[in-house]
């Protein structure tokens, strides 16, 4: 087998085979990476929504609960805002990226997120919501008002500009 044409043909076949194998391998790896990324993002979004769905019940009438919440919001104007419609905003970029409302509850007044804006591919405002719940709990307890965890609710996603998540169902 002293013919160099055979060696050249084998080398060309290996190069062409490697090109086709490389494309298929790249495509397969890309699909696997995309699936993993979507799964990871979905898990993070579900975790964030579960925590944003957590409510607290302030064992006081709405005016007393509003007084506690107003005081907390006014102390942190860069994080929280009073909205014209009586709700409260949690700021990520805009003053109302998440909207918090006080709702009558059988045990007093429930504080809950009713809408949150999606930025950077997922709902934001989780840290500020945690802080708001903590500060309201401390403020209420300082006035001898008890606070308890309230019912969870769920959200539905609305596409648009911007994308937002809105409360759909309150569970007891």
Stretches found by the model and what they are:
Residues 4, 61-63, 77, 123, ...:
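Proline-rich intrinsically disordered, low-complexity coils
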């Amino acid at each position: 087998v002293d013919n160099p044409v055979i060696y050249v043909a084998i080398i060309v076949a290996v190069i062409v085979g490697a090109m086709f194998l490389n494309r298929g391998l790249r495509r397969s790896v890309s699909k696997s990476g995309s699936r993993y990324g979507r799964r990871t993002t979905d898990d993070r979004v579900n975790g964030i929504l579960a925590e944003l769905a957590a409510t607290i019940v302030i064992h006081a009438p709405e005016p007393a609960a509003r007084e506690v919440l107003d005081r907390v919001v006014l102390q942190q104007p860069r994080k929280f805002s009073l909205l014209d419609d009586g709700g409260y905003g949690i700021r990520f970029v805009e003053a109302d990226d998440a909207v918090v409302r006080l709702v009558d509850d059988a045990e007093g007044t429930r504080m809950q997120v009713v809408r949150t804006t999606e930025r950077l591919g997922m709902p934001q405002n989780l840290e500020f919501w945690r802080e708001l719940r903590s500060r309201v709990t401390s403020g209420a307890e300082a006035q001898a008002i008890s606070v308890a965890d309230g019912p969870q609710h769920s959200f539905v996603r609305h596409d648009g500009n911007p994308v937002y998540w809105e409360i759909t169902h309150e569970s007891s």
